[in-house]
UniProtKB/Swiss-Prot annotation:
Organism listed in the record: Mycolicibacterium paratuberculosis (strain ATCC BAA-968 / K-10) (Mycobacterium paratuberculosis)
GO CC aspect terms: plasma membrane
PROSITE patterns named among the record's database cross-references: VWFA
Start and end residues of each VWFA domain: 98-294
Similarity comment: Belongs to the UPF0353 family.
Domain of life of the organism encoding this protein: Bacteria
InterPro entries documented for this protein: UPF0353, UPF0353/GerABKA_families, VWF_A, vWFA_dom_sf
Protein name per the record: UPF0353 protein MAP_1207
Principal subcellular localisation of the protein: membrane
Location within or outside the cell: Cell membrane
Topology class, membrane: Multi-pass membrane protein
Amino acid sequence: MSLPFLGPMSLSGFEHSWFFLFLLVVAGLAALYILMQLARQRRMLRFANMELLESVAPKRPSTWRHLPAILLVASLVLFTIAMAGPTNDVRIPRNRAVVMLVIDVSQSMRATDVAPNRMAAAQEAAKQFADELTPGINLGLIAYAGTATVLVSPTTNREATKNALDKLQFADRTATGEGIFTALQAIATVGAVIGGGDKPPPARIVLFSDGKETMPTNPDNPKGAFTAARTAKDQGVPISTISFGTPYGFVEINDQRQPVPVDDETLKKVAQLSGGNAYNAASLQELKSVYATLQQQIGYETIKGDASVGWVRLGALVLALAALTALLINRRLPT
């Protein structure tokens, strides 16, 4: 958590937990203070004229004189927590990630169950996704139907992706596995170029489709969607699938109405096999919401960040209060 004027604070993920041994010293100082106060009280009782003491001393000695010592001990505890190195989760923008947007352009995307049609809605939402994605991410675009084509190799140039989205054209059949394999090849190619570390850049495939794979008909075929999803998992590339449309979609083919219901189950299985997440959207607004969620997941990574600053500032504040109360109450620092 982060508090106003103090900064990040956490009570977990300590990097130097052995510093908590210093609390034994703090406890020893507190015990020493208590013993000194008891000894002081005994000395006063031993040498004082009891009749005179009772007449001039208050019946109940003020406990406020102990406040500076209490605050001093509290500040030492706070400084100890800070020295132990607490951490918290910090989200930072990714700069080396690769995202491949794989879009189904089969004839079923003509369906008008989502206005004006599935393709037009997909284009609008995908362009918004490209605009809002973290600038340092390399975004690529693949269109697939019976075959898959790399329209834009992974790049930080968002205009190239948006221009290509405007030029998507319908085609026959649906080869989902081909689209995934093509995306994996594009990721491997750009990963070799980007480099920049011992590991390849993190990558993600965002697969957008509305229907069942028709080529091949068996998704477990060597070129099928399920086989491609397993390959993606082996390569450490999760697939986020978006099934778009309603169960009531249809297209006109040779003056015949052909039902094209959305196929949620196949895409859900693809996401599961690859280690990714599955989403579904039945409207443009829902689709934009899904893309916004993906943007947050893909555009940032979570790392451990320092959370000791707040404890240091709070400790300094309490220490200052200890000094101030010592001057006001006892006219000197506690001994």
